Amino acid sequence: MDAEPFYDGYAPKEWERLERHRTEFAVSLRAINEFLPRPPCSVLDAGGGPGRYAIELARQGYRVTLLDISRENLRLARQKASEAQVSLVDTIHANAVDLHGLGSARYDGVLLMGPLYHLLSYEERVQAIREAMRVLKRSGRLFAAFITRFAPFRYEAIGEPGWLVEHPVYAQQLLETGIHDQPTEFAKAYYVHPSEVVPLMESCGLRTLRLVGCEGVVAEHQEKVNELTGAAWEAWVDLNYKLGQDPTLYGASDHLLYVGEKSG
């Protein structure tokens, strides 16, 4: 299934997903808050779904424009922003590979927290990154999320381990190419090998500031951690943010977040 119809039917679950996966959200937000210029600068959340990050950043005082391929995601984002009593500058229905309606050098920060999951070809991924770079101001910060090559294998090991022998050809395809194009409950996707990320982003003109595994050491077994509150929860966020920066653990996370600066 293509990304647009998938998310049109999945918007409430996508909003809830980051409640079930609190570590991913908390670690990603930690990196965003560390490297994004202070509010009230301007931010484009391109492919931001129902607005989890956009609404949180708006709450912090950023001027946030949310763009997404799914109209249902945008509708839910407007609803959630109203409930949170925050304002988004705009909500735009568009594809992250073509931001022709947005002016160049317009934003202090750009988030690509989903589009690169669903662009199967290298050329499309480069196009999305270059479009994000175009609308980013000089020395602006780009935050790009990826799903790792090994995430679907962890998922199947927990839920349906027989999948590996029932679909050996497809499993080999995932390992070798990272391309998910089969009719399953998830949209078509590209699962990146961790070694690809920095070369890809730097080839587009970015200076690397940080690469972090968003789940640290708790990918697919974070239920008990997610129940924590207060100091115990913050201690695990601190630990996972620290360990997520260890290159030997990049593949242990389901998601990677790249942080780069536009040079030149």
What are these regions (language model features)?
Residues M1-P39, R52, E56, R141-Q173:
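Conserved class I S-adenosyl-L-methionine
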Residues H100-V110:
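A short acidic, Gly/Pro-enriched loop at the edge of an enzyme's catalytic core
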Residues D108-E123:
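A short SAM/SAH-binding and catalytic strip from SAM-dependent methyltransferases
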Residues R52-D98:
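Class I SAM-dependent methyltransferase SAM/SAH-binding core
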Residues C204-G264:
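C-terminal lobe and adjacent flexible extensions of AdoMet/dcAdoMet transferase-like proteins
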Residues V126-R138:
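A short glycine-rich, Lys/Arg-flanked "PGG" loop and its adjoining helix->strand segment in the class I
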Residues K188-G205, L211:
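Short alpha-helix
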